[in-house]
Amino acid sequence: MSFSGHRSWAQHPLCFCILVLACVVVGQQEATGASPSPPPETSSSSWSLVPGKVKEWMEPLVTRPRERWPWFWGLEAFQGFVQTYFEDHLKDLVSRTQAWLHSSKDSLLSKAHNLCPQLLCEKGDQD
């Protein structure tokens, strides 16, 4: 999957969110009997058609792979995927976040100090 202008690190969370969304949709379909959705009712606003259109576009994306890859939708496969995703991308998230916050704080303090007038922020012993 290639998005122009986006960094590759942003693609992993997007793919993960799409996968979780697909699993939620499958779970809801199984709970409701997996019947196809009725056509959306007409309303005065065209914005009211958006949820129906999104569902209409998403259903084939979910049902086709579900029918072709039944092994993928099993709980074990999904748990394995989540565990691998965690180990590959989120395991050191705490240390990376702390390092980023520390560097951001230092950078912000440096910028604030550079913007501060010399009379207010000057270091030294002046009486």
UniProtKB/Swiss-Prot annotation:
Keywords: Lipid transport, Secreted, Signal, Transport
This protein's GO CC annotations: high-density lipoprotein particle; very-low-density lipoprotein particle
Main subcellular location of this protein, as a coarse class: secreted
Organism per entry: Camelus dromedarius
Protein's name according to its UniProt entry: Apolipoprotein C-IV
Protein family according to the UniProt entry: Belongs to the apolipoprotein C4 family.
One GO term of the biological process aspect: triglyceride homeostasis
Pfam assignment, any one: APOC4
InterPro entries, sorted: APOC4
